[in-house]
């Protein structure tokens, strides 16, 4: 296994899905809190699993990040201090459920520095398009499932993915 993606799972019946949590967080202006909690909790769980020998040291962690939110400079400093040994394994996934905030994106790039990588998640859905590929210049492109589904029998989908790769 080369990489794992950290996914949000909800244990409360009233908040029955990650989409519900994100909608509520957006309505309550709490996306930053979700961004911070996700980054720290997912990464600390990943480190714990590595320390227990359940994950190889070179395994990458794909960490979902909200396009319009970013950690503060203080958060980034704390994160780097706490997880310095993992930074080269970290891939920040930009999800495009909403339009990308250019300032937030630049803060994410600065936080990564020469370490870590950037991924564009669910390309082909939401706000994602060719412009986002050019603007983000991601290290990884995760193509949306609607494009990948039945790609083995759909020549148009095959050509689309071929064009992205080339």
Please give the residue ranges for each predicted region.
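Catalytic core of bacterial c-di-GMP phosphodiesterases, primarily the EAL and HD-GYP domains
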Residues: 32-107
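Short, contiguous acidic/charged loop-to-helix segments that flank catalytic cores in large enzymes
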Residues: 25, 151-155
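Cyclic nucleotide signaling catalytic output domains
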Residues: 20, 24, 41-44, 64, ...
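Conserved long alpha-helical elements within nucleotide-processing catalytic cores of c-di-GMP signaling
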Residues: 19-26, 32, 110
């Amino acid at each position: 296994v080369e990489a794992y993606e950290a996914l949000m799972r909800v244990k409360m019946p009233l908040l029955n899905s990650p989409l519900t949590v994100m909608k509520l967080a957006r309505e309550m202006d709490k996306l930053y809190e979700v961004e911070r909690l996700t980054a720290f909790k997912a990464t600390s769980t990943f480190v714990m699993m590595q320390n227990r020998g359940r994950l190889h040291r070179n395994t990458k962690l794909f960490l979902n990040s909200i396009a319009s939110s970013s950690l503060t400079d203080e958060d980034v400093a704390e994160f780097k201090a706490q997880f310095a040994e993992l930074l080269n394994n970290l891939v920040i996934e930009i999800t495009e459920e909403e339009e990308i905030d250019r300032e937030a994106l630049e803060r994410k790039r600065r936080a990564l520095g020469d370490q870590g990588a950037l991924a564009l998640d669910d390309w082909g859905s939401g706000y994602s398009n060719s412009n986002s590929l050019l603007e983000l210049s991601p290290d990884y492109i995760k193509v949306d499932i609607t494009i990948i589904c039945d790609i083995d029998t759909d020549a148009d989908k095959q050509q689309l993915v071929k064009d992205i790769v080339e």
